[in-house]
From Swiss-Prot:
Pfam families: GST_C_6, Tom37. Belongs to the metaxin family. The modification Phosphoserine is found at residues 249, 284, 311. InterPro entries: Glutathione-S-Trfase_C_sf (IPR036282), Glutathione_S-Trfase (IPR040079), Metaxin1/3 (IPR017410), Metaxin_GST (IPR033468), Mito_Protein_Transport_Metaxin (IPR050931), Sam37/metaxin_N (IPR019564). The gene is MTX3. This is Metaxin-3. Could function in transport of proteins into the mitochondrion. GO terms for biological process: inner mitochondrial membrane organization; mitochondrion organization; protein transport. Residues 278-312 are annotated as: Disordered. Keywords: Membrane, Mitochondrion, Mitochondrion outer membrane, Phosphoprotein, Protein transport, Transport. It comes from Homo sapiens. Part of a large protein complex spanning both mitochondrial membranes termed the mitochondrial intermembrane space bridging (MIB) complex. One of its GO terms (cellular component) is mitochondrion. SUPFAM superfamilies: GST C-terminal domain-like.
Length: 312
């Protein structure tokens, strides 16, 4: 019997099986294709790598990045696109490229760069999933990585300043959402009544943006005006993830939000404490290193010591 396929990914909240877009893409595709994945949610007991999440562990190998994981699943006969025509397959590749170029930078900015969102939602949530003291370090690194990823792809002339880049990525993201809404129309999925790879990608990118409660919501507000995209996300959640979610009542979600607020305060206090300790250590006077005294041997002792070194 073949070893089960195990997917390591970030966990969920706000009614989502995962708050991480790339993890959601793989989870949705596995549901659509019937791939029997065992999901291992990363929490504060996790000791593995988090840099390339999601990670698919097979009997012989480890696969990371959504595109590579989906290709592996297709080779294992778990193909959500088997009913698509050649043109629909080409459209899928074009739309995925559009999502990664036009929508992903705005999603990264909303979660990791927008200051209010990062400090009140993103940082405390991810810190709660990571063991101490990495919980104080890794979210910051992930934030810098997201910013570098945005600037690498969008910080080209004539957009030199971050504010110019921010304005452009949100314009592009809204245009992308409008295009997706027009393409979906009144259909259940993008290519009819059966979900495919494109549906997994769109769901993975849109669902966190739609469900997570942010203080700064300019792109979220635009998305919520596109009712067919919101219905698309809700239908996938209710049809494919209902049992795994267990349902969160409004009262329960308020409890989650209250706990997150407490966690935010705790993480910020710990971060401030470590910064103060670091500043104190840097400012404290540093004593010169002590030199060990050199013992001088008498001629007789030197002769005896030399003889002992030569002895077996």
């Amino acid at each position: 019997m073949a070893a089960p396929l195990e997917l390591s990914c970030w966990g969920g909240g706000w009614g989502l099986p995962s708050v991480h877009s790339e993890s959601l893409v793989v989870m949705a595709y596995a549901k659509f294709s019937g791939a029997p994945l065992k999901v291992n949610v990363i929490d504060n007991t996790w000791r593995g790598s988090r840099g390339d999440v999601p990670i698919l562990t097979t009997e012989d190998d480890m696969v990371s990045q959504p595109a590579k994981i989906l290709n592996f699943l297709r080779k294992q006969k778990y193909n959500a696109d088997y009913e698509l025509s050649a043109k629909q397959g080409a459209d899928t590749l074009a739309y995925i490229a559009l999502l990664e170029e036009k929508l992903l930078p705005a999603v990264l900015h909303t979660f990791w760069v927008e200051s209010d969102n990062y400090f009140t939602v993103t940082k405390p949530w991810f810190a709660s999933q990571i063991p101490f003291p990495l919980s104080l370090i890794l979210p910051g690194r992930m934030s810098k990585g997201a910013l570098n990823r945005i600037l690498l792809t969008r910080g080209q002339p004539p957009l030199y300043h971050l504010r110019e880049v921010e304005a452009q990525i949100y314009r592009d993201a809204k245009e992308c959402l409008n295009l997706l809404s027009n393409r979906l129309g009144t259909s259940q999925f993008f290519f009819g009544d059966t979900p495919s790879t494109l549906d997994a990608y769109v769901f993975g990118f849109l669902a966190p943006l739609y469900k997570v409660r942010f203080p700064k919501v300019q792109l979220q507000e635009h998305l919520k005006q596109l009712s067919n995209l919101c219905r698309f996300c809700d239908d996938i959640l209710s049809s494919y993830f209902r049992l795994s979610l267990g349902g969160i009542s409004p009262a329960g979600q308020e409890t989650v939000d209250a706990n997150l607020q407490k966690l935010t305060q705790l993480v910020n206090k710990e971060s401030n404490l470590i910064e103060k300790m670091d500043d104190n250590l840097r400012q404290s006077p540093q004593l010169p290193p002590r030199k060990l005294p050199t013992l001088k041997l008498t001629p007789a002792e030197e002769e005896n010591n030399s003889f002992q070194r030569l002895s077996p």
